[in-house]
Amino acid sequence: MISPDKQYEADTNLYNPSEIEKKWQSIWTENNLYKTDELTENSDKFYALSMFPYPSGNLHMGHVRNYVITDLIARFQRFKGKSVLHPMGWDAFGLPAENAAIERGISPSVWTKKNISHMKSQLKLLGLSVDWDREFATCDENYYIWTQYLFLELYKAGLVYQKESEVNWDPIDNTVLANEQVDSEGKSWRSGAVVEKKLLKQWFLRITNYADELLKDLEKLDNWPERVKIMQDNWIGKSIGANINFNINTNPEKKITVFTTRPDTLFGVTYLAISVNHSLIKKITDQETIQDIENLKQYLKNNKNNELEKIGIKTSLIAINPVNSEPIPIWVASYVLDEYGTGAVMGVPAHDLRDFEFAKKNNIDIKQVIVKDKSEQSKELDNAYVENGYLINSNQYNGIANTIAKLKIAEEGVNNGWAENKIQYRLRDWLISRQRYWGCPIPIVNCKKCGSVPLNQSELPVALPKDIDISANKINALGDNNNWINTTCPKCGIAAKKETDTMDTFMCSSWYFLRYPSSKCSNKPFEKVEINKWLPVDQYVGGVEHAILHLLYARFFTKALRDNKLFEIDEPFKKLLTQGMVQAAAYKNNKTGKYVSPSDITDLSNPKDPIDNSKLEVLFEKMSKSKYNGIDPESVIKKYGADTARMFISVSYTHLTLPTSVTV
């Protein structure tokens, strides 16, 4: 009888998995068993795809789970008689490869190709039914030429622009991060560094042009996890309201504009709050107030990753409420954000919890303008009333339901010129500039006469230079490479410079699924006829951590390229499975934000950083090379076989997290 408490050793005399699996995998390869069948009019197709891996050098059990789940689905669909496309590739650009190459004093290209070779052999050990004929890496020139081509297509469509902007700067990786790459604690998604703000000239994509369609089309994604759709919905953050203009009493020509979703509470406004960088700050002349604002700026800078106190500084500025001409004091407040709306908000303490707390702390009037029942009168409130109800203390709108009054007051404002109906989004345009070497070069030339000029498509690819200097703990920036940077302007012909920023790696992964159906196409990124046959992907498998990064960007790319008439599909992925993560212990130095390899720790029962002797926090986290907590599946496969490894990783529900402390 088999006991669940007993450990059993594999009897290699009875069963030698390595020998059996090697034999049959060779037969599969020789017979090209998993080559994708050509689609005909009568073919029933199925496109199965895992989010392609970053070639870190070694697979871990988290990778295995992702690819085995997709493989099970692909095999099942083949058994049903369908033509199955199940490809694999490599998300090969990015900072991890550049940093690893610097540490070892070799080219990122050499490092990456070596890793791809090793990881490919590991994937083959798993016996995946992959069509390897369609393989590519995003760092291949014959791939990133088409990333540059698509950049130019988006440029022609008016979806690419450059501007000087305050950006998120990673001081460890020395590069810019998109908003989506900064976590809720204000730290870099990759290095863990506390992100700083810096003013730089950057390239952006107008993803906001598609905000409404990206939001509406979530309703079409019936076979996506609800939590992923909610995350995208919240990230896009649509707010329907109005911009309200308040005159400044000392200067009738000067106005302050406030966005609000609650015009029904305008009669309850008892203060306006502006950010520390609002343009009105320049109108303040009182030196004590100016110094207080500078102190608040420093406080915000020092505490940007902590919960902020509701600090307020009353100014001498007075606004005029457009609905009743009452004077309203203007405060500088710690909670007002520069990057959202107009950098100014109206304070309605009676009907907003945050405003209520701010008003109580700063002795600001609280005026109730909504009650639950028509018969109620205003009273002293113990807390903000935030439910629907009926207006009071609101002149001609008294007794009207606030949901109706919201529309009527906005309409009055529009008719009288002090309001404008407005839809606002939390989503910001996608910042794609990166100040590092190992990425796709941006196909732009900077000319003193013509400005920034896009290259002609015949001049692609703009290839990365191979004569790189790896010294001083960095790879020389593209701007320091005179052999590479100097060129001529494609417009006027005078001497010019190539753009020295490279693209965010998500640019490469936002369209890779479009390349697989015609991966050998040499004169365009993909064959339109093949896209229309195979897309959308029938089953996509990958981690939920990509909900507002890769998945949102891929949806945007698909819609933008559709509008450029490159194909007809609206959405890239029909079904999405976000498999549960495979976790293992990771050791983090909270002082530096860096993870430490367990092999470098003397005593795992009392883990300390070997460099500064700091006590390490033990976290049970998703397996990752950057966290040094991956478990190598090769050792499992070598001892127990691929089928055992596949079964082990597939036994639990696919969407659940699988904690593991596998010892082989």
What are these regions (language model features)?
Residues 2-6, 14, 23, 27-31, ...:
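Residue patterns forming the tRNA-binding/recognition surfaces of aminoacyl-tRNA synthetases
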Residues 40-43, 51-52, 87-96, 135-143, ...:
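Short, solvent-exposed turn/loop segments enriched in Gly/Ser/Thr/Pro and often Arg
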Residues 8, 12-49, 78-87, 114-117, ...:
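Conserved oxyanion/phosphate-binding beta-strand-loop segments in alpha/beta enzyme cores
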Residues 257-277, 502-513, 545-548:
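Conserved phosphate/anionic-ligand binding catalytic regions in large, soluble enzymes, centered on
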Residues 54-85, 188, 317, 340-371, ...:
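Conserved active-site neighborhood of enzyme catalytic/cofactor-binding cores
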Residues 70, 83, 278-373, 378-379:
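Catalytic alpha/beta core of large soluble enzyme barrels
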Residues 213-237, 279-310, 471-482:
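Amphipathic alpha-helical
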